[in-house]
A protein has these predicted regions:
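Extracellular/periplasmic metallocenter environments
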Residues: 1, 47-87
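N-terminal edge beta-strand
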Residues: 1-21
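Beta-strand-rich interaction surfaces with strong enrichment in secreted/lumenal proteins
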Residues: 12-14, 42-46
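Short beta-strand/loop motifs in extracellular/secreted proteins, especially
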Residues: 22, 32-34, 76
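Asparagine-centered strand-capping/turn motif at beta-strand->loop junctions
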Residues: 26-28
Length: 87
């Protein structure tokens, strides 16, 4: 689960297995809306205050992927690190 409060992701960095689809559960505990976004993957999810939802990431190659809260781009950053087995 990833909690977003006042434009800050907790945790703000997660590791996932490369080559597998991954479900991320998002919980917006902030007073306003959240727009979870990654342009490269064409992922965009808007959550109202107090809402809970999820996104499914595609099979990722090993590497780092950045997601933002479009409404709070300076503080709202989440780094997803896809690791191959044994890394």
């Amino acid at each position: 689960e990833i909690v977003v409060r006042d434009g800050v992701f907790t945790p703000n960095r997660i590791e996932v297995p490369a080559g597998r689809r991954v479900k991320l559960v998002l919980i917006n505990e902030g007073p306003g809306p959240l727009e979870f976004e990654n342009d490269e993957m064409h992922i965009e999810k808007v959550l109202s205050a107090g809402a809970r939802s999820f996104v499914v990431l595609p099979n990722l190659k090993p590497g780092e992927y950045d997601f933002i809260d479009e409404f709070n781009p300076i503080t709202g950053e989440l780094k997803v690190i896809a690791k191959a087995d044994g890394q």
